[in-house]
C-alpha cells in the first residue's frame, strides 16, 4: 500500500519519461493500492485519470476528489483486497490543500473535500451489510496527509494531537471501524499506536 506522491517531483531519469519508470517499478513490486497524493496531480487530472491510471496495475484512490460542483467521485474511492479469508477495504484520500499545491489549470474540473469525512462516508458504505455497494471485514485508511513531526524529531503522538490541525482530525475523527491508518505528505517518520475512540482497541 502507498499513501501517495508516488510520481511527480521525482529524479530526472523518471521525470523526463513522465514517471513511467517509477510506475513500472511499483507495478513490479506488486503495489496493490495507493491513495493519490498532491504530486499525482502535477500534470493535471486528465493525465492522472488517463495515462497514469491506465499504466498502473494498482488503483489510484481519492475518496475526497469530486467532479466540479458535485459530490460525484472523480476517482475510485476504495479497493477490496483479499488477505486469506478476509476482505480488506482500503480507502484513500488526499490533502484538502491540494489546490494550493498544484497548477489550477490541471484541476479546474474537480473539487477536493474533507478527507476524513470522505473516508468515514466510504467506511459506512463498506460496513452497511449491503454487498451491492461493497463490503469489507477490515478497513484501512490511506491518507495523503500527516504529522508535522516524527519520532526522529522527538515527537510523540500526544504532542502531535495537541498541536491540532489535519493530523489530529484524521486520528481523532476517523470512524472507529477503520482498524489502521497510513499517512504521508509531510515526509516524517513515525509509527504510533492509539486507542480507537469508543472501543477498547488500539
What are these regions (language model features)?
Residues 1-202:
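Acidic, metal/ion-coordinating pockets
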